[in-house]
C-alpha cells in the first residue's frame, strides 16, 4: 500500500506486516455529526484494506472525555462529567455500528491516562521545554527546532488559528496542564491536562514506539497534530508517526461542518431518513483527502448505487453476509476483489474502485441474463459480493430486508395482513379487491412483486 503523507506531501509505501494506527476520536459532549462520521468511515476503509492485504493491524481511536466544552455542558446541566461523557460515548458507538465501522482494538479515554500525561509533562519540564503562567504549564515552541515541520507552513499562516488569552512567550505556545482546583493533584498544582497532551500520552502508553499511521481530520493538522508531534519529539525523543493522514471537511453551503459554527448535521438526523450503509457509501464516495459539500441529492444518488448491489443480491437470493471474520484472516479469491484491492492500495483511490464495482454489477447482471441457471456463475458472483462487502464495509444486509428498510413493526404487520387479503381475493377471482389493495399499498409507497413463491413487497424510494 502507498499513502500520501501530509507531512512530506509524498506517497510512502507501507511494506510492514504489523501496522499501528491511531485515529483522533471525538470530544464527547454532544452527538456526532457527519464530519465525525466521514473521518471514521474513511479510516475504517483503510483498516479493512490493510486487513484484506493480510496485515496485522493495531487500531486505536480515542475519546476526549475532559475538555472545556464538556465542562461547559456540565455547568449548564445537573449531570456529572462522567454521566455526560458516558452517554455520548455510547451514542457515538451506536452510530459507528450503524455505519459498519469496525470496533477499534483500543478505545482510550483521556481521563484514564492522567498519570501518563503528568509523566510526559515532567520529562518536558526536566529538559527545559516548559514554563509556568498563572493559569497553567505551557510548552515553549521556540525550544523545538522542528516545530511546524508537520504542517509545513510558516507561523504567520498558522497564527490566525490560535487564541492568545494569556501573555505567552510565543503566540504558538500551548498549555500542557491547566490549573483547576476541581480536578487532579500533581506536583505542578491541581489541574487537568491540555488537549494536545492527551493524545501523545495515550499513544505512548498503548503503542510505545513510533506509529505507522496517525490519522484525523484536516482541521487537526494545526495546531493539534503539530503540537502532538512536538511533545513526542521533545518528551519521548522520537517521531510520533511515520505517516500522517488527514481527511477533508464535510461542508454545508461551502462552509466546514462544525458544532462551533452551528451548522452541524448529526449522524442520527441522517439515519432517520437513510440506512447506515447508504450514508457510509455516500461518505466514502469521494477521496478521503477531498472536501465535499453535503447534498441530499448526492446522498440519494449514493443510495441508488447501493440499490444496484442489493438488486443483484436479491436476484441471487443471497442473504445476510457476516462481517465477523473481517478482523481475522480474510482470503481474497475473486478476480474483481483483487482488482479493487489493488486500486485501493494506491492511497485509497475510492472513485476508481467504485467505478469498477459499478461495472462488475452491470456485467454480472448481463451474464445472469445469458445464463440464469448457471450455478457456478451464481456462486462465483456470490463469493465476490461477500469479499467486496468486507472490503468496502457495505452490502452485508439481507436483500429483502434492505428493500423493506424504514418500515415499523406495526406497518409491517398491516402490510402482511393486506397481502394475505389480496392473495385470498385473487384465489376467489375478486380482482377488483386485489387491485384496490395494491393501490392502497402503493399510496403508502409499498410496491408488490408477485413471484412463483408468493408475493413479496418493497418500500419505494421517496
UniProtKB/Swiss-Prot annotation:
Binds 1 zinc ion per subunit. It is found in: Cytoplasm. Keywords: Aminoacyl-tRNA synthetase, ATP-binding, Cytoplasm, Ligase, Metal-binding, Nucleotide-binding, Protein biosynthesis, Zinc. ATP binds at residue 259. A motif ('HIGH' region) lies at residues 26-36. Gene3D superfamilies: Cysteine-tRNA ligase, C-terminal anti-codon recognition domain, HUPs. InterPro entries: Cys-tRNA-ligase (IPR015803), Cys-tRNA-synt_Ia_DALR (IPR015273), Cys-tRNA/MSH_ligase (IPR024909), Rossmann-like_a/b/a_fold (IPR014729), tRNA-synt_1_cat_dom (IPR032678), tRNAsynth_Ia_anticodon-bd (IPR009080). A motif ('KMSKS' region) lies at residues 256-260. GO terms for cellular component: cytosol. Pfam families: DALR_2, tRNA-synt_1e. Zn(2+) binds at residues 24, 199, 224, 228. It catalyses: tRNA(Cys) + L-cysteine + ATP = L-cysteinyl-tRNA(Cys) + AMP + diphosphate. Monomer. This is Cysteine--tRNA ligase. It comes from Campylobacter jejuni subsp. doylei (strain ATCC BAA-1458 / RM4099 / 269.97). The lineage of its organism: Bacteria, Pseudomonadati, Campylobacterota, Epsilonproteobacteria, Campylobacterales.
